[in-house]
From Swiss-Prot:
InterPro entries: FBPase_C_dom, FBPase_class-1, FBPase_N, FBPtase, Fructose_bisphosphatase_AS. It comes from Mus musculus. Induction: Up-regulated in pancreas by obesity and dietary fat intake and in diabetic animals. One of its GO terms (biological process) is cellular response to magnesium ion. Homotetramer. This is Fructose-1,6-bisphosphatase 1.
Length: 338
């Protein structure tokens, strides 16, 4: 009879992983405190998302946020959870949220050395129809010795210490990117811990799926439309790419990370700067993509090289498998040279 224990007794949890990385880096433990607090917020949001219908958390709260999106009740709850947990970590000094017009400066007695930019509930327009939604975050180290201010958040994505997202889907998955690579953790509700399920994730160099909202095609740059035409009707006679678009960035990005392919949210005539926000959507996801061997670009430059000028700045994005993004860039540069 096989000697299988009914329970794993040496579990690789997110907390354990982060502590190990901190020990290797001979850190102070502040980043571990921060990530543990963020995890608690994510667990609470995951629980709220699953109870939303019963707890009457669906629907609109009756206002719009700074970027013009209608604010849902779950948005407000999620935002408050993340802010309160990060404040209580004693590891942050400045917080930037999609839901707040201005940066949040942490009170002096609770300050640490990190700046966190986050979207507490990405894809919240999909809440009422039960489509997967998520939380996105990027963590920077405060560089100046001055009093904390909004300027501390205006760092390029290359300066990220850690970034990632939580996906509230058929299970709750947390994807964390750090210098050591990209690792995936799944929430085990029976013990309330994130368990490592994929270590040092690497993307396929080329996929067979493209993802964007083609409803805006009439306003796209000609380079986008030429690229899409190539994917649908390959000139070499190969199989066309499949089209997949959920409309929840975290869901579309996670599929791209797992299966390969390309995700596009380009600029168009109505949104010449794109629609996704640089600090708490584009940069964290671009960081994950690059650490997993993919690419992330605006067309003109790498997303992680953009130096932000304001906290709710927007950027067009094309990201995914390296060969797919390179193929797009060849077409984009050809059109730009005309």
């Amino acid at each position: 009879m096989a000697n299988h224990a009914p329970f794993e007794t040496d579990i690789s949890t997110l907390t354990r992983f982060v502590m190990e990385q901190g020990r290797k880096a001979q850190g102070t433990g502040e980043l571990t405190q921060l990530l543990n607090s963020l995890c608690t917020a994510i667990k609470a949001i995951s629980s709220a998302v699953r109870q939303a219908g019963i707890a009457q958390l669906y629907g609109i709260a009756g206002s719009t946020n700074v970027t013009g999106d209608q604010v849902k009740k779950l948005d407000i709850l999620s935002n408050d959870l993340v802010i309160n947990m990060l404040k209580s970590s004693y590891a942050t000094c400045v917080l930037v949220s999609e839901e707040n017009t201005n940066a949040i400066i942490i009170e002096p007695e609770k300050r640490g050395k990190y700046v966190v930019c986050f979207d507490p509930l990405d894809g919240s327009s999909n809440i009422d129809c039960l489509v997967s939604i998520g939380t996105i975050f990027g963590i920077y180290r405060k560089k100046s010795t001055d009093e904390p201010s909004e300027k501390d958040a205006l760092q390029p994505g290359r300066d990220l210490v850690a970034a990632g997202y939580a996906l509230y889907g058929s299970a709750t998955m947390l994807v964390l990117a750090m210098d050591c690579g990209v690792n995936c953790f799944m929430l085990d509700p029976s013990i309330g811990e994130f368990i490592m399920v994929d270590r040092d994730v690497k993307m396929k160099k080329k996929g067979n799926i493209y993802s964007l909202n083609e409803g805006y095609a009439k306003d796209f740059d000609p380079a986008i439309n030429e690229y899409l035409q190539r994917k649908k009707f390959p000139p070499d006679g190969s199989a066309p790419y499949g089209a997949r678009y959920v409309g929840s960035m975290v869901a579309d990005i996670h599929r791209t990370l797992v299966y390969g392919g390309i995700f596009l949210y380009p600029a168009n005539k109505k949104s010449p700067s794109g629609k996704l926000r640089l600090l708490y959507e584009c940069n964290p996801i671009a960081y994950v993509m690059e650490k997993a061997g993919g690419l992330a670009t605006t067309g003109d430059k790498d997303i992680l090289d953009i130096v932000p000028t304001e906290i709710h700045q927007k950027a067009p994005v094309v990201m995914g498998s390296s060969e797919d993004v390179q193929e797009f860039l060849e077409i984009y540069r050809k059109h730009k040279a005309k």
